[in-house]
Amino acid sequence: MISIYGLVMALMMASVLASSSRFQRVPQSQSVVENESVKFECESTDSYSELHYDWLHNAHRIAYDKRVHQIGSNLHIEAVRRTEDVGNYVCIATNLASGAREASPPAKLSVIYLESASVQLLGSNRNELLLKCHVEGASGDLEPLEIEWYRNSEKLSTWKNVQLDQHRLIIRQPGSEDDGLYRCTASNAAGRVMSKQGYVYQSSVKCLPRLPRRKNQKMMESWDKQTFLCRGKRGGAAGLESLPAAPEDLRIVQGPVGQSIIKEGEPTALTCLYELPDELKNQRIQLRWRKDGKLLRQVELGGSAPIIGHSFDSGKDALLREDARLVLHKQNGTLSFASIIASDAGQYQCQLQLEAHAPISSSPGILEVIEQLKFVPQPTSKNLELDAVVAKVHCKAQGTPTPQVQWIRDGENTTLPDQVEVDANGTLIFRNVNSEHRGNYTCLATNTQGQINATVAINVVVTPKFSVPPVGPIETSEQGTAVMHCQAIGDPKPTIQWDKDLKYLSENNTDRERFRFLENGTLEIRNVQVEDEGSYGCTIGNSAGLKREDVQLVVKTTGDGFAPEESGGDGFLVTRAVLITMTVALAYIVLVVGLMLWCRYRRQARKARLNDLSTKEAGGEQPDAAGNGKGSEQEPCLSKQHNGHSKSRSKSSGDAQKSDDTACSQQSRASKKSAHIYEQLALPRSGLSELIQIGRGEFGDVFVGKLKATLVTSPSDKDADTEKQHSNSENGSGGSGSGSTTLSTLNEKRRSKTSMDDIEEIKEEEQEQHNQSGLDQLVLVKALNKVKDEQACQEFRRQLDLLRAISHKGVVRLFGLCREKDPHYMVLEYTDWGDLKQFLLATAGKVNTATAGSSSPPPLTTSQVLAVAYQIARGMDAIYRARFTHRDLATRNCVISSEFIVKVSYPALCKDKYSREYHKHRNTLLPIRWLAPECIQEDEYTTKSDIFAYGVVVWELFNQATKLPHEELTNEQVVQRSQAGSLEWSVAEATPDSLREILLSCWVSNPKERPSFSQLGAALSKAMQIAEK
């Protein structure tokens, strides 16, 4: 109690006393292997006053000695002891002038150690064998102990009836193939240990290994390939222990007794001398060698007849693999090894087996192999990224005894530079990589056999970046000059390569008089021609990677293409040449158009026949005729099936396929199913009107417009009934509200929509009245401009599949797809109040929405914020149940209607309107302030990463979207801290107390510990009930 009180008082003094001192470096929590050294750093930014530093260990002042001492402001501990040094360390900075004190946050020290391991039997019966690996050790805050199980030196993994569950080994329905010696190993940063004693499991045999036969009866040669069923008496307990003993004169004189130690690569032999009486020479007797309980080699000593029966069966656990190094001599029973390898180490035993008798076994002998010292694998040179937080170079060595691994730096100074260390496994770790880390490093492995070394070259590089990227489009007139800039920085200095329409440009394949490649990377084109128009790409690269930017060159012609008339016959000749050229070109165009029309007619006729056959197979179901055949012309971007949720509703018969096989039919069958899906979504482009561009997204422009009411189809009855039943099962049905959007009735609508019953209401009647009234539907249109960009096309297809597969009131509807021509249009549901973020800013007074004679809408109440969060959680739960992920959940990607209904949408205006909320990371625009750490580090998107983003959305709601998450940090700092796991999150001040714990759990680094959307919905439901009271 006294120590805790002292710590509390020290922290209170630090928070109360005014001081200009702030910590520039605070002590960090660390995990260290026992007997290694550790350093806690502490430094204040107050350079104008004299400061005194003290250290506390578990709220007690540290008594310094030779092992624990303070150098400057830093604390050094040599030879860390787990019994004395574990705990919290606090740095106290005292201003000697003012007497003010400031305490750093506590830093935890965890000690990693590993002593022993043992195998414990938890349960054994005929249905299950349960073993546990008990380990004396700890791994601190790093990765947990790694447990491996072995059966007779064979490593086990989860397969068939074997299950590995943390420290436990479970074998379901154990049989004879599971017999053997079970041992376990444990490893962490402190080393690796194996259990000294294992557990031997031996199953019982249910019948005698004997077949009835008459006297002097000879078996056919092919009988050795037959399989015989051996069934014992029901309820009987006969086994190997009930077999009669072999005759006393059949015995093993000398076996592999004792322990043999052999160097790797040397020959050796194991002795098994036996005595075989003359009266048993005609009997079937077998000599066997076993290694760790498994059959290794066997040979027949008696009669030539094959041995049949369980006792002579090698079984599934045999090691009878082809190995020319092993020879079993029949004359004296010796097992010889031509060359010993490390895997030959183990326990060996020889046996004599007489038919229908218990085996005779020798005493076991131990063979130990002195493994040759070597690197596994050989260390290799590596390029390290400048300013990388952590970089590792591995060096693993094997040998007997276990070698010690250390690193040195070549040159005059062999010691390692600062921020470079070696862990217990021999891995060279670089922290905060800088240019001083460049050089040659040598890994030394040493044991009693000697020393080996391997040298690697470490090069510190800088990823190439554009200092002056190409900006476009560039417009120039014919005969003019075009200059496209492209300058880059990096280490090594990046090379710059230009290409036109994905074809590389160089001085060898261009006109040197017109094309100039400047030393700084700029491309200059003089006397520009019409054929120079196109897409130009600049690629920069070095050993650290590649980057590319595109720019469009547009050439404007100055005339109509005809040369002016000249005097005499020259002008006439030029005019005649132009007329002939235009005539030939027109004839060619007419021919091409005719061929295209003819091919389209043939394609539509073939498709009609296939649909007729599919209709007959499906029982007369009418084929989809949307688009009048235009959907059959597939763009390359939408010709592939990329999601398992897209399933075709009809299949063509084999005869129909064979009857219309052409040169392209084989290639088109693979995309028939996905093409059928897109045909069902087909919408005519003429049905869209009043398109207004609101921004640009990741693959094109984004518009708001109207869709003709005749083209709007209501959701299927099945989906509506399912959603209605789901809603009623939780909270019942509720009332309805008005659709007016005036400010005078706005507050009443929002107050009437804060209960769960009103949120769960599905306004089916109002939707039907809206559709029957003939009013055009307000829609969001996303254009696919980057048709040749595979990444953009893949994301376009993913969003299509996501919105097509979900029918839920909390997710916007997908009305269809316009793909008659480029660009393709994705048509989504939109609302009269637009995106949720603009609505929040308006209610917070950040956006001027007031008109004459009216006032701005008031801020949302806590009940209304909970209502919005609940609806978003329900929509995301529907996405999760459809086995999809959103990947960009934020208030900017949700929409809200005048009925206070919130839906999850996908505008993703990342190029202009909300560009400051996105950051280009690894050549991809990402909402890094909403992304989970695993998305930034490993590009891994799951439902748990959507849970992380949902926590940020709730943070936005309670802050009225007036500020960005971690707006005090730059984008690069957010990425760096997220990768390092040091980005700290806290809930908004207005968050109810009942939600704080579950919202904080949304941001934990381990995805498995985050809640589900159903759990979040339940918590929000309770919070809403409390708020209503």
Swiss-Prot record:
It is a single-pass type I membrane protein. It is found in: Cell membrane. Residues 716-727 have a biased composition (Basic and acidic residues). It comes from Drosophila sechellia (Fruit fly). GO terms for cellular component: axon; plasma membrane; receptor complex. Residues 651-669 have a biased composition (Polar residues). Interacts with plexA; component of a receptor complex that mediates the repulsive signaling in response to Semaphorin ligands. InterPro entries: Ig-like_dom (IPR007110), Ig-like_dom_sf (IPR036179), Ig-like_fold (IPR013783), Ig_I-set (IPR013098), Ig_sub (IPR003599), Ig_sub2 (IPR003598), Kinase-like_dom_sf (IPR011009), Prot_kinase_dom (IPR000719). Residues 21-104, 105-195, 247-361, 364-459, 464-554 form the Ig-like C2-type domain. This is Tyrosine-protein kinase-like otk. The modification Phosphoserine is found at residue 674. Residues 19-577 are extracellular. Residues 613-675, 714-756 are annotated as: Disordered. It comes from the Eukaryota.
